[in-house]
UniProtKB/Swiss-Prot annotation:
Designated name of the protein: Methylenetetrahydrofolate--tRNA-(uracil-5-)-methyltransferase TrmFO
GO cellular component terms attached to this protein's record: cytosol
Keywords assigned: Cytoplasm, FAD, Flavoprotein, Methyltransferase, NAD, NADP, Transferase, tRNA processing
Keyword DNA-binding: no
Keyword Cytoplasm annotated: yes
Organism, as annotated: Latilactobacillus sakei subsp. sakei (strain 23K) (Lactobacillus sakei subsp. sakei)
InterPro entries for the chain: FAD/NAD-bd_sf, MnmG-rel, MnmG-rel_CS, MnmG_N, TrmFO
Chief location category: cytoplasm
Subcellular location: Cytoplasm
PROSITE patterns the UniProt entry points to: GIDA_2
Role, per record: Catalyzes the folate-dependent formation of 5-methyl-uridine at position 54 (M-5-U54) in all tRNAs.
Length: 436
């Protein structure tokens, strides 16, 4: 007797719900495991699938914004999450925001009533047999986190997210910064933002008085002991940063031949060199405060923040070492991961990873090769980034045009460039869709 094809999906958040939907609509049975309400997490309040635990905004809806473009790609692939969001949208200008309770209820009802989906309300602490999508989120239960660590090695799983802000290279003033490595060791790998004593003191005063974001109840400072926020370091004394990330020694300005009073370094963040992060600037500051204070750094007066610095509880894997761009485990080919634990950041990005993982898990269950989404698409660029960026400095990332495969022609105007990237992405997804 032949066994019917099936896939296990662990977790019914945004990623797991999307994965389950994509699998079921391809005629494959789904065993969907969700531990709520039997065991709740500190962040969830209901037993509904795809519960939005923070904001009700799914961010921009226009395709000239990468967050909007990824939504449109998902619409074209019949995303349950985007369909539910469109159905339960509330006025939000150019953004897509939802009435959170009916949004989650829509997703729950569609999955619970689908003939291919069997829901199991229980906690799993080990990977089941057969094709499986693990989408247990940033608050993965300890038992399963241990299982993931055992699969990937002790260094393969992080328990907090401590990331410095990431900037668009095109927004940096290159008349004020210079390329150099400390003591000229190796290749000149850093952009350096020099500060005078007066500039440093003004920056210091703004930094120590800036507003800090509130931590959630389930977050604890102990997660961050190994990675001090820049504002905490600053409060230990006006000179402290000068012996840390703002140390000027060995970074003489080639334009003047002099050593600045302080230097903020920017490190290349992706292979295309379109993104740079501010070295050592992991922070708890509110996002608006980050923009205000960090734009005081010479050369960053008009900086565009692709991602703000964050420090929060987050279970995520060192994906460049352990995942393929199909969202498959390198250790076990019938095991897929999706959602924030893969290093994608944001509601929609999590759902998008579930969409890709779900399609590929269903293909595996049907004895078909998994597929890699084109890097010219928002979904493909996310999958490529989290599996090809530097493992040493890996931190979660949201959808942005900086991680896309560059256009063949150079377009200076930002709006025109974004439109060209969007046009190419949607043409790619339409062509790619025909192969699925």
């Amino acid at each position: 007797m032949t066994t019917k094809p099936f896939v296990n999906v662990i977790g019914a958040g945004l990623a797991g719900s999307e994965a389950a939907w994509q699998i079921a609509k391809r005629g494959v049975d789904v065993h969907l495991y969700e531990m709520r309400p039997v065991k709740m997490t500190p962040a969830h309040h209901t037993e509904q699938f795809a519960e939005l635990v923070c904001t009700n905004s799914l961010r921009a809806n226009q395709v000239t914004n990468a967050a909007g473009l990824i939504k449109e790609e998902m619409r074209r692939l019949d995303s349950i999450i985007i369909a539910a969001a469109d159905e339960n949208a509330v006025p939000a200008g150019g953004a897509l925001a939802v009435d959170r309770t009916p949004f989650s209820q829509t997703v729950t009802d569609k999955l619970a009533n689908h003939e291919r989906v069997t829901v199991h309300h229980e906690e799993l602490t080990a990977f089941p047999e057969g094709p499986t999508v693990v989408a247990t989120g940033p608050l993965t239960s300890p038992g399963l986190a241990e299982e993931i660590s055992a699969l990937n090695g002790s260094e393969g799983l992080y328990f907090y997210d401590a990331a410095a802000p990431i900037l668009d290279k095109n927004s940096i003033d290159f008349d004020k910064v210079y390329l150099k490595s400390r003591y000229d060791k190796g290749e000149a790998a850093y952009l350096n933002c020099p500060m005078t004593e007066a500039e440093f003191e003004a920056f210091y005063k703004a930094l120590i008085s800036a507003e800090v974001a509130e931590m959630h109840d389930f977050e604890d400072e102990k997660f961050f002991d190994g990675c001090m926020p820049i504002e905490v370091m600053a409060k230990r004394g006006i000179k402290t940063m000068l012996f840390g990330p703002l140390k000027p020694v060995g970074l003489e300005n080639p334009k003047t031949g002099e050593q600045p009073y302080a230097v903020v370094q920017l490190r290349q963040d992706n292979a295309a060199a379109s993104l740079y992060n501010i070295v050592g600037f992991q922070t708890h500051l509110k996002w608006g405060e980050q923009k205000r204070v960090f734009r005081m750094i010479p050369g960053l007066e008009n900086a565009e923040f692709v991602r703000y610095g964050v420090m929060h509880r987050n279970t995520f894997m060192k994906s460049p070492d352990v995942l393929l761009p199909t969202y498959q485990s390198k250790q076990r080919s019938d095991l897929f991961f999706a959602g924030q634990m893969t290093g994608v950041e944001g509601y929609v990005e999590s759902a998008a990873s579930g969409l890709v993982a779900g399609i590929n898990a269903s293909r595996l269950a049907l004895d078909t090769e998994p597929v890699t989404f084109p890097a010219t698409t928002a979904m493909g660029s996310m999958a490529h980034y989290i599996t090809h960026t530097s493992a040493k400095h890996f931190q979660p990332m949201n959808a942005n045009f900086g991680i896309f495969e560059p256009l063949k022609q150079r377009i200076r105007d930002k709006k025109e460039r974004n439109q060209a990237l969007a046009d190419r992405a949607l043409a790619s997804i339409d062509t790619f869709k025909e192969t699925l």
